[in-house]
């Protein structure tokens, strides 16, 4: 179970996701927790070892195959950045996220990610698809072609 957005395992707001804006896109809206997002990403440890990625080599949005997931259904650090960092990511944005273990996979880790791991993700938001039945104006949603 993940801690609530922006909170650590004890519920205190003293852990932060650090976001470095690499590229500003042309999107105008950020995802909400129930939206499905399409992203290109690379995850690595602070020593530079890559543990997960959706593309090989340098990011080329034209040839990369984005992964999709629900914005509120991932580790708290990702959800926080997608929805709240600098007002939330917009379609076309590329950010580098520095996620402390409390907002990542915690003290227990996950799969090949050891506990207490600080994670670095390079994330490119490609598209946002709202949950069916969610009321949003057409102008609020951009979806990748």
Please state what every model-predicted region is.
Residues 1-145:
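Cross-family detector of peptidyl-prolyl cis-trans isomerase
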